[in-house]
Amino acid sequence: MIIDKLSKRINERSIVCVGLDTSTDYVPEKIKKGKKVSEYLFEFNKEIIDNTKDLVACFKVQIAYYEAHGIEGLIAYKNTLKYLKDNDLISIADVKRGDIANTAKEYAKAHFEGDFEADFITVNPFMGYDTLEHYLPYLESKEKGIFVLMRTSNPGSKDIQYKDYKGQPLYYEIGDNLNKIAKDYLGECNLSCLGFVVGGTQSENANKIRERYPNIMFLIPGYGAQGAKPEDIRVYLDNFKKGIVNSSRGIILNYRKFDDGEENIGKYARKAVEDMRKDIYCE
């Protein structure tokens, strides 16, 4: 199962997930010169991937940064996912799909097959749990996985997710129902191919959330630029075995801190990953 592969990568490499949220603004002009958007976005991503792949569990590609540039951007998105697959690296397509019925079926096909194939995708359950229906057959095949939004890292998460529902925050109602579904898709590592997105910026109830869902892998955004603290993140990881911690700008823009950064983008991305690992693992 793909969750077993991810679990193994965490144990062998680290809990770090590199976010390839690659804005065109992040790419130095010297790389852009004379190239199409599809070419320079992929070139930038490849530099990051090549210099960090042995240190990290996986890579998360946020589709919005590519969709914004039409066909050219989506070519870069496709090529990035293909490069990850060709190098036996685990990919998460951050697409946050949240529709139902035949539309969800087409979304599942779009992101688990063909040009945009990824190992995991992110899913939004706001419309109801039938949003998951057409992704589950891909989990049954043991080759794909999903991370479903449970409690997110953005400040506005409290507008809805923290609302009282039967005496507890609404996010527990979401998590409890997802947990029932997730138990049908356990790997040998005793974790499910249905994971949760749990923001690291909110330390409230961290221990309770981790204990309540022992068979769930957490995708944890918020580290770095968003300010999640390592001591809070460690709780969600459960001895560094049940979570991956995403950092995007903190890694891919680290080169901007150095005078020779534009000539050494990959080198400084690697340094950011090394520093992140030391920070979280207390090395």
Swiss-Prot record:
Name of the protein described by the UniProt record: Orotidine 5'-phosphate decarboxylase
Source organism: Finegoldia magna (strain ATCC 29328 / DSM 20472 / WAL 2508) (Peptostreptococcus magnus)
Active site: 96 (proton donor)
Pathway: Pyrimidine metabolism; UMP biosynthesis via de novo pathway; UMP from orotate: step 2/2
Pfam families: OMPdecase
GO MF annotations, alphabetized: orotidine-5'-phosphate decarboxylase activity
HAMAP family reported in the protein's UniProt record: OMPdecase_type2 (MF_01215)
Keywords, ordered alphabetically: Decarboxylase, Lyase, Pyrimidine biosynthesis
Leader sequence segment: none
Family as reported in the entry's similarity comment: Belongs to the OMP decarboxylase family. Type 2 subfamily.
An annotated GO BP: 'de novo' UMP biosynthetic process
Protein EC: 4.1.1.23
Gene: pyrF
Catalytic activities: orotidine 5'-phosphate + H(+) = UMP + CO2
Record bears the keyword Lyase: yes
